Amino acid sequence: KRDGAICLGTIDGAIWITHLKVKNGIKLPATYVLKEKIQGVKENRLSLTFDMSYKTFYEIGSHKDGDVSYLCFNFHNGAMNSEQAIRLKYAFEYLKETAKVIVLIGARDFFSNGIHLNILEDSQKQGEDGWSNINAMNDLIKSIIFADDVITVSSLHRNAGAGGVFLALACDYVVGKENTVLNPHYKTMGLSGSEYHTYSLPKRVGQKKADELLKNCLPLSTQKAKKIGMIDEVFSHTDYFDSLRSYATSLIDDEDKYDDFIYDKEDYLEENKKYINDCKENEIKIMYPEFWEETSLFHKLRYDFVYKNSSSETPKRLKGY
């Protein structure tokens, strides 16, 4: 087993099964579903920065291209539990030791969608595990924001929602593939949100537009996101990764320009450290009862979401959109 998945031997090799669900249940990591049947099975771990050229199941991997490191995190449906967020943080911090630029790639199907709602719904300690999950996400994002010795880039080549959008906005630069869809809001899940969004979103689009995006809960394309200043560049889907590579390497082509950026970043973070941390602390203060109180709307909306209890009609906010 590895990172919630199980490996089964076959006639001609082996197959990794990452998720399962019992009848009338919800999809969960395979080891969660089979926990009583796989006692004693050893965990076959990989290094935090696994070389993705080797063919096996992995959740976190990296690729180095000169002074640019690409960090991939292939979490199912873009959802990230506490343990995954912690591992990703450690992988990011390890790559900082040898890279000048770190590019966050995300997963094959989604960039990221924030905390892991299915695992929280399955938990016997929903408040405690939800609180742990959001704080682990915040620790990851703090590590990215305060990485004052590298340039960080997020690559939105797949859709992102809620905390996953704000994970991307934690980076110095944000680029995306054309027609990728972003949902930069939390309210439809009964949450006010954290992940430093009250710092990163207004920083890019201004307070008025940030409030509008969070309140209206509408999706927007990467093209629209660039137009309002939320992201920096949009590349064509036909040559996206070539464009991404050129963009990342261009950030270190001029050594003097790179050094100036790092110096300015260090000064900015030092001057704004208290403000940035205060943003997160205020977010968490508001979120606390949303996780812990039994009457919190989050519990009902999360249940409906994971059990796919859809509305009988299109929400008003999406009609005609």
Locate each region found by the language model.
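An anion-binding loop in the catalytic cleft
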Residues: 1-57
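STAS-typified acidic loop motif
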Residues: 48-87, 108
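A structural preference for short, pocket-lining loop segments at secondary-structure junctions
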Residues: 66-73, 85-128, 139-153, 179-181, ...
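Hydrophobic/aromatic residues within transmembrane alpha-helices
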Residues: 104, 167-169, 225, 287
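Long amphipathic alpha-helix in the N-terminal Rossmann-like dinucleotide-binding domain
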Residues: 133-136
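Crotonase-fold acyl-CoA enzyme core
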Residues: 146-149, 153-162, 170-181, 185-259
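C-terminal long alpha-helix characteristic of the crotonase
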Residues: 231-298
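Patatin-like phospholipase
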Residues: 295-299, 310-321
